[in-house]
Amino acid sequence: MNKEEAKILIDFMEKIGYRFYEPELLYNALCHSSYAHEQKQRGRKDVESNERLEFLGDAVIDLLLAEYLYLEFPEASEGVMAKVKAAIASEEALAQIARDINLGRYMFLGRGEEVSSGRERDSLLADMLEAVVAAVYIDGGLTAVKKVFLSYFAKYAKEVVEGKIVFDYKTSLQEITQARYRKLPEYVLVNEKGPSHMKKFTVELRLSGKLIAVGEGPSIKEAEKEAARRAIEKLKGD
């Protein structure tokens, strides 16, 4: 890694309060595939995509959450624990934790991801958080992961259990509409505009043909999530 990249790693380690024994692990975790591809085209051989770390991080987060929920909520049933774990391991929740530690500021992205607001995209932030969790796990074990991240996961787990926050908007909305109306929501793409690297999609959410909410986002998936979030707010107010 070069000096500029090394400085970013030092800043991030200070941010999360953990100093890596092997900083190369963190460097790998922060390298998006777009950045690795660009750097390899420039002749660099030390830059690898973080995709393998994402795979491991997903499993580490599952273990961290399962252990925490089992110990912290002894009265909770398997079904309740599974539901809470799914909510906290969702893309939306992981992206929020990534924002809590300002992860977007420290990521290494290719030019295309930079211009398309990759640093703010839920999917990219969630994947990057998984990679960083895996890097901490390899470097310092589960104890280090708990030290760095458990407080963030625990905070949101408690809020989900208490019903104070929703992360998986589409699933939550589906549960509401099935229980209340015995119907499933329908998502309809009604508009798509902008250049290929800066698309903006508009989705209408309908229930039994009736317009309930509209969502916009840089992808159809993000627009659907926003529509579901707005629909939940509206239905809770009814």
From Swiss-Prot:
SUPFAM superfamilies cross-referenced by the UniProt entry: dsRNA-binding domain-like, RNase III domain-like
Main localization (coarse): cytoplasm
Annotated ranges, domain DRBM: 168-237
Cofactor: Mg(2+)
Gene3D superfamilies: 3.30.160.20, Ribonuclease III domain
SMART domains in alphabetical order: DSRM, RIBOc
Catalytic activity: Endonucleolytic cleavage to 5'-phosphomonoester
Pfam families: dsrm (PF00035), Ribonucleas_3_3 (PF14622)
Ligand binding (Mg(2+)): 54, 127, 130
Boundaries of every RNase III domain copy: 9-141
Keyword line: Cytoplasm, Endonuclease, Hydrolase, Magnesium, Metal-binding, mRNA processing, Nuclease, RNA-binding, rRNA processing, rRNA-binding, tRNA processing
UniProt keyword Chaperone present: no
Protein name (Swiss-Prot/TrEMBL): Ribonuclease 3
Source species of the chain: Pseudothermotoga lettingae (strain ATCC BAA-301 / DSM 14385 / NBRC 107922 / TMO)
Gene: rnc
